[in-house]
């Protein structure tokens, strides 16, 4: 399988890199102390830039060679004429040249027209956008740098960018570009018009077991693809299961950017655990609402809670709360909770507040109750119990696939089957499967205006060195080796910029081409770890 994503971080065009050459020094004179903060910051930024540059150069050569090797292996197994084979080789060569040009482009927010906001959370928003030059549609995730740092999210957003950049699978949302400006980080991803699984659950309330089987099977393959990359998702929930135009599942939010991490304090949860009797008493006392009232209240606030800074703990495994050491099994716990919600109509540990939910999860052996009056099959009940448990939980996708609940599932071809619910789309820009959000006045171009207003004082080198380093200078462009101060938030996001090889495959074609050859089996979970 070809490696569709090339983890090459844009280091700017040739003329931009000339900024590193010596220039006439017209900058403000600072302390000559070699250990001063500005000197240390510039040294660190230069070191990070140089290291990243050579890592990328080496990786670029390696991945380009791998794409050629993959093509030749595919051609060996296809009965093509010599002319057809040579045409495909020439097409790959052209794509490689196009990709080199794409990597030299400097992207900015004004390159994209915002059509509509389709999601908003504590740290930013997601919009359907159109690239002004190519007219291609994307989902643009915009995150505020200051909030990322204040809420200690820098590592999480970088993790999401790294996983998306390295993912070569149809089970994870594609990342085409990432870039930044003075105030924001941007992830330019494929637009999936089907909405998310949470919207389906809100709309239909309860799935049949056949419907649940299909979506859980696809979610297993999606989680497996992330595990194959060497990652644990840790935030599997209906909000993070997106649906494409045909209703098939793709994973998103791979960085815990809106997850429940702010409450992941071992001291906090150890305090909640206490002794077993204390917890039982708290659970007995903390029940002011009836179950019917509790479910109704939860459904009403479902979407707002998903986009809050705290998030929801409903799908989180107990070992994540306690931070006592956990592995891939935490994602299978979340899968079991989602299955329960699909066939019952609400999560298994639904409570009046997050503290009570956490207490129930930590005592899942006693608090997990599966309704006996809903006609659920013994297979689905057993699968839930094998996933939502502290001990003897399933450890791998292969184990789960063998469960009787999945009898008859065609794992190798499921993505080519019809989904239970296929989105009804009136146009490529249809956003009817997303909630409606109001535009924030004067927000669309604030980054570009800010850059223009500060152009005489702060020189933005974020696309030149994959950061957003600014340097004080009275009249002319500076460079990373010059005088000035580097902001703390700038150092945190050096290396964020990315341009993926998939960007050259955006324009569809009906004839046999390189992209179609490398995607002859869309149901596979093959992926390459960077």
Swiss-Prot record:
Active site per database record: 235 (proton acceptor)
Localization of this protein: Cytoplasm
Recorded catalytic activity of this chain's protein: L-seryl-[protein] + ATP = O-phospho-L-seryl-[protein] + ADP + H(+); L-threonyl-[protein] + ATP = O-phospho-L-threonyl-[protein] + ADP + H(+)
Major enzyme class: transferase
Compositional bias annotation for Low complexity: 450-461
A single GO molecular function term of this UniProt record: protein serine/threonine kinase activity
Record-given protein name: Probable serine/threonine-protein kinase ndrA
Organism expressing this protein natively: Dictyostelium discoideum
